[in-house]
Curated annotation (Swiss-Prot):
Gene3D superfamilies: 2.40.50.640, Nucleic acid-binding proteins (2.40.50.140). It is found in: Cytoplasm. The gene is rnb. This is Exoribonuclease 2. GO terms for molecular function: exoribonuclease II activity; RNA binding. The lineage of its organism: Bacteria, Pseudomonadati, Pseudomonadota, Gammaproteobacteria, Vibrionales.
Amino acid sequence: MFQDNPRLAQLKQKIQETLPKKEGTIKASDKGFGFLEVDSKTSYFVPPPYMKKCMHGDKVVAFIRTENEREVAEPSELIEQSLTRFIGRVKLFKGKLNVAPDHPQLKKLSLKAKTKKGLNEADFQEGDWVVAHLVRHPLKGDDGFFVQISHKITDANDKIAPWWVTLAENDLPNSEPAGIDDWQLKDDADLVREDLTALPFVTIDGESTKDMDDALYAQQLPNGDFALTIAIADPTAYITPEDEMDKVARERGFTIYLPGRNIPMLPRDLADELCSLMENQVRPALCCSVTIRKDGVIGDDIRFFAANIKSHARLVYDHVSDWLETGSSEQWQPSEEIAQVVRDLYAFSQARANWCETHAVVFPDRPDYRFELSADNDVVAIHADMRRTANRLVEESMITANICAGKTLQTTFGFGVFNTHAGFKAEKMADVVELMAVNGAPNADAETLATVEGFAALRRWLATQETSYLDNRIRKYQSYSEIGNQPLPHFAMGLDVYATWTSPIRKYGDMINHRLLKAHILGKAPVQTPDETVGEELALHRKHHKIAERNVADWLYARTLADEPAKETRFQAEIFDINRPGMRVRLLENGAMAFIPGALILDNKERIECNGEDGTILIDKEVVYKLGDVLEIVLTEVNQENRSLVGKPTQVFADLVSETQTSTEQPAEGAENNEPQA
C-alpha cells in the first residue's frame, strides 16, 4: 500500500537530504556483506541488503546512516562500475542463462544473461568461457544486474583455455593477421641495395625458430679490432606506412609471446618465409657496419645501408654454445669459413662484454623458464634455460646495433623510437642516497646518481656485493623503462642513447626506425615520423602482453603443481617482495611465484614483523629473512580457480620459553649456555 505513495517518497527524500554522503570503493566479502572504503584509514560497513545494489570494485556515493548503533553505508549513486566488458563462465539455472565473472571477488555472483543478436543460446553449456558486458545495474535505476554475452571463447574443458581466455581478457588477437596473395617489393626508387650475398653471414636462433630476423658477420682485423656487419630482415621493403598491413602492425605493436606459443605481429607468410633470413636464400636486408675496437669501444665509422644478403649457415644456440664452450658439438661441425666467422663473433662479444662490465651495466644471469607442451596442450615439462655463450654473442651484437641506430637517429633527425630509462625517481633520490650511505656505497650522492655514469657505477658496485639484498631494495626507487620519440638516456643499461631496429618482424617501433634509417641512407625526409602517441601506444601494448604472459604462466603453474602440496615437495625459492601480509617468492626450479603469509612463517603477530620498507622479516626483533634470500619451502595450497600458489618455509621457529618456565626449571647439565632457537 506504501509502494507508490508520493508522500512517503517525499519524506524519504527529505531524510536522505539530511544524511551525510561519502564517496568510495566497494569491497565485498564472501559472506554477503561488504565495506565502503573511503580511504586507507576510513571504511563503513555495507549490510547484505544494500550489497545487492552494487558489487565488488564499484565506485559509489553512499548515504551514511546509523542502524543498531552502528554507522553503515547505503550506496545511492554509481560513479564507475567495476564490471563493463569481462570474462566469465556460463551457469545454467533451470535452463536459464547466467554468467559468473572470472574474478576472485566476483566468482560467487551469478548474473542473469542473454546472448547478443546472432548468437544461439543453445550453443552455450555449463562452464563455457565467454566475453560478456554488464548492461544493467541497480544503481542506474535498473531492477537488477543483467549481462549480454558477446562472444564464446571456448568450451568448458578445452585445454587451450589458459591461452584463449587470457588473450580475450586483455582484448588481444589469438591468431596472426591474414597475409596477402602477392607481396610486392616497394623500395624507394633511389634506394640502392648492395650485393652482399657472397659475405658469409650466419644466423643463430632457437632450433624451432622460423622468423629469423638477424644475420651476423664479423672479421677480426690484424690490429685486433673487429669489423662487424649486422643484417636485419626488411619487412618495410614490402609494407609502406599507407598500407592496411601497417595499420594492423601498429594496432598489435609486438608479436605476443606466451608460454608454449606466440601470436605474430605480421602474417606468417611474411615473417616466417619472405622476410626470414633463411639459409641459402637471397633476402632484402637493412644493414649496419661498424668497427669495434679490441677494447670494446664502438668506432665512429657507423654506416647504415640497404643490401641483398644470403645466410650461409643456419645455426642453433645450443650447438654453437657447445662448440664454443667445449670445442665440439655432436650436432654441428662447421666448415672452416663458418668456424672462423663464429670465432670472430665470439671474440667481438667478449670485448663488448668486458667494456660493459667496466663502463655500463651488466644484468645478472637468470634462467628463462620454458613450458614444454604436448599436442593436447598439457604441460610436459618446465625447463630452466640459462643464457649460454651463443645467446650472449647474439645479445651483444644486437645491443651494439641498437646503440649505433640510437646515435645515428639522434644525430640525423633528433627523433626516432627510443627505449629510455630515467634512473631513480626524483622523489626517491634522497632515500637512495641515505640507504647507500649507510651501506658504504662510494660516490652515491644525488648529483652523481642523477647521471648515467653515476647510476651505472652504483649498479656495478651493487653487483659486487655478497647478496642481492641492496639491489632488490633500490629497485622500487627506480623509474620504469619507457618508449618515446626523443633521444633520452637509458640509465638501466648505462647507455646515453638506445633505439631498437633489430626485430622489425616482431616490433612495430623497429619498423618505424627502419623507415627513418632508410631516410638517413637516402638523405631524404622520412616517409614516417614517430608522433607523441606512438611511445604510449607501444608501452601499453607491451604492458598488456606482459600481463597476458604472466596470467597464462600462473594458470599453467597452478595446473602443473596441483599435486605438490599433498606430496610435500620441497622447493628452493628466492624472496623478491616483502610486504605487511607476508612475502612473495619465486621457485628456482620452475619460475613459479608463490605467496607466503606471515602466519605460515610464525603464527604469532606479537613476535613476527613483515617490514616492506626495509625488505625484511623479523622474529623477536631479529631479521630472519630479507629480499634476495633463498630458502626451502613447501606448497600448502594450489588454488586453480584463482591460479595462485601459497607456501610456507620448512624452517620452524620455536615457541618462546616463558620467564616462569625458565625460573622454575633447572637446565640440563652442560646446557647452561644454550638459548632457545628463534
